């Protein structure tokens, strides 16, 4: 936000509620910007130009009064640009009332533009690594095979991305230092930070159950049938005791939930199977360290048993940043499953994810041949091409799958 502010405004006025908890007292008892801004100016030691500057409120989850004041900044001081950010806002904006979970009454609905920040995508990563190659990447349309030289170069960057993932601090370290050991240490620290955040909220939440669910994601994915099983958490575990823990992790954007479908039909949301789902981690860099995957296994494209699920997590992460609705999967029996199903326009699109180490039997080809959907996608290490009834799209082009279908 500071970088964005410096590039687009005359001056950035940055306030961090976590670093300076006393800032919260400025927002107590008033929501009036004309009373709040002079006090912030004293703290900052500089005048805030309401027409030229930007006000940045970081870690706003630590100050509910500041969050609620955003409505009044919008109404009473519309000429001032205000940006706010916080971790775990998805859960901190919710509170229990009468057994229900609802947003606070004073939450500025309709007054604030909410942006969910996804991890850095492969496309964004490539832009920072090789801007010239990125421009070529962004020009790709249709499904004609790419020249081998570009295919190999893009695959090399994809392999590096798998080791780094998309967490901004980790990506920034990789770009500035290029030290794999430092990258791994930051990823390990983030995993620990996730767990520390969960423990911090113990009492308001059942931290023990949330940690059990979070730590079960990798072993549950590693099963031949990766559907989430409550019984795998601990002996006698039932859904009723852990549903809230899963909802907390999803709202906190620590895990991604992919629901099963009872039919591959548009609209997908009408065919959710609510009690059948898989859980993935939010970022593949964190999945790498939690699963204990060595960087060289990814860079050298080695086969290993968990690789198929790891690459699925990568694909999901790239798809989740696209604005076309939730990603699903389809499984009718243990031997009939399609990795993902996405909604593209008014089409339900089956998706197969293939990695070099993935030897699972697939129902994808049988479904495509029998149902003949308008679009069908296979993400793999092979070059871009129309392959019979489906389009083969290389894994590095997942963020641009829509352009490849044109």
Task: Spell out what each predicted region is.
Residues 19-51:
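Short glycine-rich substrate-engagement loop in P-loop NTPases that contacts/grips substrate
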Residues 81-87, 116:
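Structural recognition of the conserved hydrophobic beta-strand(s) that form the central parallel beta-sheet
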Residues 342-350:
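Active-site beta-strand-loop-beta-strand hairpin of nuclease catalytic cores
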Residues 1-11:
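P-loop NTPase Walker A phosphate-binding motif
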Residues 171-342:
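Accessory nucleic acid-recognition modules appended to NTPase machines
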Residues 355-393:
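Catalytic cores of nucleic-acid endonucleases
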Residues 93-222:
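Interdomain motor-coupling "hinge/lid" segment immediately C-terminal to the ATP-binding subdomain
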Residues 48-66:
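Conserved P-loop NTPase "ATPase switch" module shared by AAA+ and STAND
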């Amino acid at each position: 936000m500071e970088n964005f502010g410096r590039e687009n405004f005359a001056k950035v006025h940055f306030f961090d509620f976590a670093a300076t908890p006393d800032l919260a007292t400025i927002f107590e008892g008033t929501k009036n910007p004309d009373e709040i801004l002079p006090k912030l100016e004293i703290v900052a030691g500089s005048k805030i130009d309401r027409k030229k500057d930007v006000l940045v409120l970081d870690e706003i989850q630590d100050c509910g009064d500041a969050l609620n004041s955003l409505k009044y900044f919008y109404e009473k001081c519309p000429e001032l640009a205000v940006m706010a950010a916080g971790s775990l806002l998805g859960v901190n904006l919710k509170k229990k009332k009468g057994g229900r979970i609802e947003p606070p009454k004073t939450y500025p609905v309709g007054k604030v533009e909410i942006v969910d920040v996804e991890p850095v995508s492969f496309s964004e990563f490539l832009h920072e690594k090789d801007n010239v190659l990125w421009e070529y990447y962004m020009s790709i349309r249709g499904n004609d095979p790419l020249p081998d030289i570009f295919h190999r170069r893009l695959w090399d960057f994809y392999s590096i991305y798998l080791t780094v993932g998309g967490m901004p601090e980790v990506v920034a370290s990789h770009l500035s230092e290029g030290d794999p050991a430092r990258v791994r240490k930051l990823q390990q620290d983030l995993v620990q930070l996730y767990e520390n955040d969960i423990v911090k909220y113990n009492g308001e939440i059942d931290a023990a159950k949330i940690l059990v669910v979070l730590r079960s994601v990798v072993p549950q994915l590693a099963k031949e049938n990766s559907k989430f099983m409550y019984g795998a958490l601990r002996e006698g575990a039932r859904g009723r005791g852990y549903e809230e823990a899963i909802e907390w992790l999803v709202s906190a954007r620590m895990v991604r939930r992919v629901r099963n479908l009872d039919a591959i039909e548009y609209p997908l949301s009408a065919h959710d199977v609510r009690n059948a789902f898989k859980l993935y981690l939010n970022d593949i860099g964190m999945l790498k360290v939690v699963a204990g995957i060595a960087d060289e296994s990814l860079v050298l494209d080695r086969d290993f048993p968990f690789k198929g699920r790891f690459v699925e997590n990568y694909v999901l992460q790239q798809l989740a940043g696209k604005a076309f609705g939730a990603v699903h999967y389809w499984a009718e029996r243990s031997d009939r499953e399609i990795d993902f199903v996405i909604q593209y326009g008014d089409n339900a699109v089956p998706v197969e994810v293939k990695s070099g180490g993935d030897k699972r039997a697939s129902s994808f080809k049988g479904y495509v041949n029998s149902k003949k959907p308008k679009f069908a996608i296979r993400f793999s290490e092979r070059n871009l091409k129309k392959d019979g009834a489906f389009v083969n799209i290389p894994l590095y082009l997942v963020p641009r799958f829509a352009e490849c279908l044109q």
